[in-house]
Amino acid sequence: MRHLRKISDYAIIGSLGALIAVGLQGCDNNSSSKSEPLSQIKEKQGALVIIEEQPQGGYKILEEYPSETTRIVLKDPSGKERMLTQEEVDKLLKEEAAKIEQGTSQLTNPGGMGLSLGETILASMAGAMLGSWIGSKLFNNPNYQAQQRATYKSPQAYERSQNSFKSSSSATAPRGTSTGASSTPSSAKGGYFGSSSSPSSAPSSSSSSSSSPSYGG
């Protein structure tokens, strides 16, 4: 994507959040200004999600922005950041799907504390794209809806996310249609980048894969 530098060029992505948002949203302002429901917005585009591991345990969504493809960046307590691979995300989502089936996911239980990395991904905007195959077992659950907002690092981060996805949708989506690459996530069944194949196991320490699609534009 021409407006988004490759992730390897960033020293600290979080500090460049505003720049990323401007680049991703520099679109035609002559489109319809009518806001669309977030459920429709999520189906039309991907998301760049920056998740921060908390020193006391658990994870929080630091920032997230609309993107043509869905990517997850993990920031550890020391400030080091890396992109999760397709295999890592597929493995996390497979584990979370099993927990949801068993009724043990903190996303579907009231008062859940210290969400796992997989649960945090599913609570982000990326969750509706990457975890669409989980369906109503998660996204129509009232406990999930209550947990989602608390997963963000701050109320301001939540509001920025909501506003950026609404703004991007109204600026880029043609009336009544969805466009090329941005429509792919709605049909995703399990793969990180919209692959319909079954999630595969992956080494937890891997940060890149020769068979994975390119992350950058």
UniProtKB/Swiss-Prot annotation:
Q: Where is the signal peptide?
A: 1-26
Question: A Gene Ontology CC term for this entry?
Answer: plasma membrane
Lipidated residue numbers (S-diacylglycerol cysteine): 27
The record's section on InterPro entries has: UPF0323 (IPR020913)
Taxonomically, the superkingdom here is: Bacteria
Q: Where is this region: Disordered?
A: 150-217
Q: Where is the composition biased (Polar residues)?
A: 150-166
Q: Which stretches are tagged as biased composition: Low complexity? A: 167-217
Q: What is its main location?
A: membrane
Membrane topology annotation: Lipid-anchor
Cysteine-cysteine disulfides: none
Q: Where in the cell is it found?
A: Cell membrane
Q: Which UniProt keywords apply?
A: Cell membrane, Lipoprotein, Membrane, Palmitate, Signal
Q: Where is the lipid attached (N-palmitoyl cysteine)?
A: 27
Give the family from UniProt.
Belongs to the UPF0323 family.
> What name does UniProt use for this protein?
UPF0323 lipoprotein WS0575
Query: What is the native source organism of this protein?
Result: Wolinella succinogenes (strain ATCC 29543 / DSM 1740 / CCUG 13145 / JCM 31913 / LMG 7466 / NCTC 11488 / FDC 602W)
